[in-house]
Amino acid sequence: MSSDPSPSTTVVPLASLAPGSRGVVTEIRIPAHQRGRLLEMGMLVGTTLELVRFAPLGDPVEVRLRGYNLSLRKHEADLVLVRPL
């Protein structure tokens, strides 16, 4: 029996997804005073999103969710945990 978690239970930082990959937000570890901005833009636990691309130097990260594209700093994307689809 393998001890590797199945893909459906694996949780990874948003910034670790490859461009074109999708995931479901499971946790947002951004401090409360910054988290409100993301919540207002629709990034909630349970939201399905797609990592669109990284800027040429890797920062920012462009994400598609709820019908629009959102750019996040890489350090913010590292604090959003997703379950890859």
Regions flagged by a language model, labelled:
Residues 19-75:
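Amphipathic, hydrophobic secondary-structure cores in small proteins
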Residues 1-17, 76-81, 85:
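Extended boundary segments
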